[in-house]
């Protein structure tokens, strides 16, 4: 057995070593939130920078399996302690909260460990890699009375909330029967590993990176572009559709599909990836509407957006603006531009406010579970090549 495999088995067997004891401290209105960052890669460092815009926050700890990522984050968080094992970071009693920005296959395990350690959690979407992980995270959050925000920042986006209030809540669209979503040409899923990673760096713990995933020898592409491999995430469906279906859920007040269908494959980029480069997902909801997702890594349509289609018109929205198109061939549209800043800052500030007030955040853990669950159903339909029937009450896939 390879030495790395032995190390990995030992690591996995000890993952449950954390106790459920709460290390949380009571924060006063003027106390600085002490934050630990787990996974300070490219996205993690950006979200960390949004946290650091709050003067009442200090990044007290950094953790990553690759010390180069820690070194880059340390340039901003100069006083932070550093770790390569998240469990050691969670032993810090002074920590109030953690930001989890690891690859998707680690989200659930680290989130549960953090919640059981008494930390509030901001975790990047998707919350889970499997449907089964969702209820476990929700349970850990509720039992430990923690705040858990999932990084679906549209929930805090001002123009999304305005569009909902003006056109959805007022009923101006009439009966909504279709929510169309699409995301074309996302280059992040086409990243190529740099030559510097051809051989595994000595300061990168590959066994720890794999964690709950089946052992395989070092593969720079699977490390660098893990989104292209279904062992580590759900491809474009969980990475991109989770954002859009969450907006649909927010608009419609309906979060649990009753059925899912999908079709797609690896049609253009035959580079060893297991996640489809092109996929279409169709979800059916109990309140008589469907939601679709169309994704391809080829250029296709410019950008990504959502279109809510009703009997009285349609609402088109993306991260830069929304457009109201009343029914009628000659009816002029209403176009409203969004404010020129990243919604992640609003989402982070909502989380930090809830850390102080103990209220539930805009993208609470249950909301995150439901949106990830909808995406997972799409992937299951794709992988099993069949229509999935889902019981919205019991949240279970029905037998054939």
Label for each model-derived stretch:
Residues 45-49, 68-72, 87-88, 108-113, ...:
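Pocket-flanking alpha-helical
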Residues 81-85:
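Conserved SAM-binding strand-loop segment of SAM-dependent methyltransferases
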Residues 98-99:
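N-terminal Rossmann-like NAD(P) cofactor-binding module of classical short-chain dehydrogenase/reductase
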């Amino acid at each position: 057995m390879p030495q790395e495999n032995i190390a990995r088995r030992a690591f996995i067997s000890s993952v449950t070593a954390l106790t459920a004891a709460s290390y949380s401290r009571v924060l006063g209105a003027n106390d600085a939130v002490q934050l630990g960052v787990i996974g300070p890669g490219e996205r993690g460092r950006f979200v960390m920078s949004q946290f650091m815009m709050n003067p009442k926050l200090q990044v007290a700890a950094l953790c990553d399996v690759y010390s180069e990522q820690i070194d880059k984050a340390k340039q901003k968080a100069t006083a932070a302690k550093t770790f390569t094992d998240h469990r050691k970071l969670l032993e810090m009693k002074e920590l109030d909260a953690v930001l989890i920005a690891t690859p998707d296959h680690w989200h659930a395990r680290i989130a549960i460990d953090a919640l059981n350690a008494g930390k509030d959690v901001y975790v990047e979407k998707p919350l889970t890699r499997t449907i089964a992980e969702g209820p476990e995270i929700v349970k850990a959050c509720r039992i430990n009375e923690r705040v858990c925000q999932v990084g679906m920042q549209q929930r805090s986006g001002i123009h999304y909330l305005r569009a909902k209030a003006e056109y959805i809540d007022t009923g101006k669209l009439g009966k909504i029967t279709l929510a169309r979503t699409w995301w074309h040409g996302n280059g992040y899923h086409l990243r190529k590993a740099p030559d510097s990673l051809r051989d595994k760096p000595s300061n990168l713990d590959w066994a720890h990176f794999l964690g709950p995933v089946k052992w395989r020898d070092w593969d720079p592409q699977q490390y660098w572009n893990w989104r292209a491999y279904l062992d580590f995430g759900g491809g474009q469906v969980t990475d991109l559709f989770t954002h859009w279906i969450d907006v649909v859920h927010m608009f419609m007040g309906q979060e649990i599909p009753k059925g899912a269908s999908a079709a797609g494959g690896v049609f253009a980029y035959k580079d060893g990836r297991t996640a489809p480069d092109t996929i279409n997902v169709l979800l059916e909801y109990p309140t008589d509407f469907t939601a679709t997702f169309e994704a391809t890594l080829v250029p296709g349509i410019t950008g990504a957006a959502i279109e809510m289609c009703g009997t009285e018109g349609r609402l088109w929205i993306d991260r830069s603006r929304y457009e109201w198109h009343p029914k009628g061939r000659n009816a002029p549209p209403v176009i409203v531009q969004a404010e020129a800043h990243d919604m992640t800052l609003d989402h982070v500030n909502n989380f930090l406010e809830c850390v102080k007030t103990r209220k539930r955040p805009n993208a609470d853990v249950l909301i995150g579970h439901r949106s990830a669950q909808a995406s997972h159903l799409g992937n299951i339909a794709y992988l099993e090549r069949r229509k999935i029937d889902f019981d919205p009450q019991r949240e279970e896939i029905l037998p054939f």
